[in-house]
C-alpha cells in the first residue's frame, strides 16, 4: 500500500520515514515539504544516505491522490485544517499528527490553540485515534486525529480507573514530563542545550493544549468526569514521556484489585505492558518502541491511587501510533512493522 508524508522534514516526519521504510506492507510513494521543495531527503537527513532516494516535493493534492492511498500529515497546528478536506475529497485516508481534528467542539480548539478551528463538516468526520480504545471506529474512518503524546500516555494510564468508576472524578492530578524532541525541531531558548542541560523547566501550567482532548475522552468514558489538574515539564532527555497520575478512590480497596483491573483491561493490547506489582517503568525501557508501560500503586493511608505510564513521545506518542492506526485501517495486525525492541541505550 502506497503512502505519502506531508511535513517529512520535522521530527514526526522523519520518524514516520524510519518506520515506513521498514514496514512490510506500506511503501513510501512521496515525501512533501513546505520549505525544502526540490531537496533530496538525504541532504536534510544524511543518515538516510543509500537508504532512501526521494526528493522532497511540493504539495499537489491531485498528484498525491493518484500516487498514494494513505497520507500522513506531520504538520504544525493549523496546516492540516486547510489541507485535509482536499485530501479526503481525492479519496485518500488521512492520518493527522497535529491537533487540528482532535476536538469535537471547534470552540474548544480555538480556546486552547489560539487559532481558528477546522470547519465543523470535516471535524465531524474525524475519529480520535487512540488505537487501543477506538479500533472499531478507526477501521471505518477516512480521517484519523492522532492523539497528542501527553494525551496518549495519560489516557492509557487512566482509562481503567475512569471507566470503572473507581475514582473520585474531581480528584485527578497529572504530573507530566517530556523529552526535548516533544518541543519540535524549531529551536527556542528553553530547548537550547545550555538552558536545558542539568536543568528542567515547567511550562504551560494549566494551559497545555492536550488538556481538552484528555477531558473530552474522560467525559466519553464517564459522564461524571470533571476538569483535571495537569502540569508539564521539559526534562533533559531527547525522547520519552513519563506521566505520574494521582486520584482518590471512592472506597477502600487493595492493590491486587487495581493490578487485576489493569492486567485484564489490557490483556488483548500488545503494546501495553503492565508492570508487576510494586514495580514502576522508566522512559528508557520504551525508548524507540511503540510500547506504553504502566505501573500502579495504592496508598491505604490517603486512599489515593498512583499510576505511572511511560511512552516514547516520537513513537507511541506520534509516528508509532499513527502507523498502528494505519495498520488497523488496512486490516493488518496492528503490530505490523512496529515490533521493535526498545533501544534502552
Curated annotation (Swiss-Prot):
Q: What is one GO cellular-component annotation here?
A: cytoplasm
List, alphabetically, the PROSITE patterns matched.
ARGC
Location comes to: Cytoplasm
Enzyme class, UniProt record, top EC level: oxidoreductase
Any one Pfam family here would be Semialdhyde_dh
* Active site per UniProt: 149
The Gene Ontology terms for molecular function here are: N-acetyl-gamma-glutamyl-phosphate reductase activity; NAD binding; NADP+ binding
> Which residues are listed as membrane-spanning?
none
Catalysed reaction, written as an equation: N-acetyl-L-glutamate 5-semialdehyde + phosphate + NADP(+) = N-acetyl-L-glutamyl 5-phosphate + NADPH + H(+)
Q: Which GO terms describe its biological process?
A: L-arginine biosynthetic process
Q: Which keywords belong to this entry?
A: Amino-acid biosynthesis, Arginine biosynthesis, Cytoplasm, NADP, Oxidoreductase
State the SUPFAM superfamilies in the record.
Glyceraldehyde-3-phosphate dehydrogenase-like, C-terminal domain, NAD(P)-binding Rossmann-fold domains
Identification of the protein by name: N-acetyl-gamma-glutamyl-phosphate reductase
Organism expressing this protein natively: Bacillus cereus (strain B4264)
Gene that codes for this? argC
Amino acid at each position: 500500500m502506497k503512502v505519502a508524508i506531508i511535513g517529512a522534514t520535522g521530527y514526526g516526519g522523519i520518524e514516520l520515514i524510519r518506520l515506513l521504510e521498514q514496514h512490510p506492507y506500506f511503501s513510501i510513494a512521496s515525501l512533501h515539504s513546505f520549505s525544502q521543495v526540490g531537496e533530496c531527503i538525504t541532504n536534510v537527513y544524511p543518515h538516510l544516505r543509500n537508504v532512501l532516494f526521494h526528493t522532497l516535493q511540493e504539495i499537489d493534492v491531485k498528484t498525491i491522490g493518484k500516487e498514494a492511498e494513505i497520507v500522513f500529515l506531520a504538520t504544525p497546528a493549523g496546516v492540516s485544517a486547510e489541507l485535509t478536506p482536499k485530501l479526503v475529497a481525492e479519496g485518500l485516508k488521512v492520518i493527522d499528527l497535529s491537533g487540528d481534528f482532535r476536538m469535537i467542539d471547534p470552540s474548544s480548539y480555538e480556546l486552547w490553540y489560539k487559532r481558528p478551528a477546522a470547519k465543523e463538516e470535516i471535524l465531524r468526520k474525524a475519529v480520535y485515534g487512540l488505537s487501543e480504545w477506538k479500533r472499531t471506529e478507526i477501521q471505518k474512518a477516512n480521517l484519523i486525529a492522532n492523539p497528542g503524546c501527553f494525551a496518549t500516555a495519560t489516557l492509557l494510564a487512566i482509562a481503567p480507573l475512569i471507566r470503572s468508576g473507581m475514582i473520585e472524578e474531581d480528584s485527578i492530578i497529572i504530573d507530566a514530563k517530556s523529552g526535548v524532541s516533544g518541543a519540535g525541531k524549531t529551536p527556542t531558548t528553553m530547548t537550547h542545550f545550555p538552558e536545558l542541560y542539568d536543568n528542567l523547566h515547567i511550562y504551560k501550567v494549566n494551559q497545555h493544549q492536550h488538556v481538552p482532548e484528555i477531558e473530552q475522552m474522560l467525559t466519553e468514558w464517564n459522564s461524571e468526569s470533571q476538569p483535571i489538574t495537569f502540569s508539564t515539564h521539559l526534562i533533559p532527555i531527547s525522547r520519552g514521556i513519563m506521566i505520574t497520575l494521582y486520584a482518590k478512590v471512592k472506597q477502600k480497596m487493595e492493590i491486587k484489585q487495581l493490578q487485576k483491573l489493569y492486567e485484564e483491561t489490557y490483556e488483548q493490547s500488545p503494546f501495553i505492558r503492565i508492570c508487576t506489582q510494586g514495580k514502576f517503568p522508566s522512559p528508557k525501557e520504551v525508548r524507540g518502541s511503540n510500547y506504553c508501560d504502566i505501573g500502579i500503586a495504592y496508598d491505604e493511608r490517603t486512599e489515593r491511587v498512583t499510576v505511572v505510564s511511560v511512552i516514547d513521545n516520537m513513537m507511541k506518542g506520534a509516528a508509532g501510533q499513527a502507523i498502528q492506526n494505519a495498520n488497523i485501517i488496512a486490516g493488518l495486525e496492528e503490530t505490523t512493522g512496529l515490533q521493535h525492541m526498545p533501544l534502552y541505550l
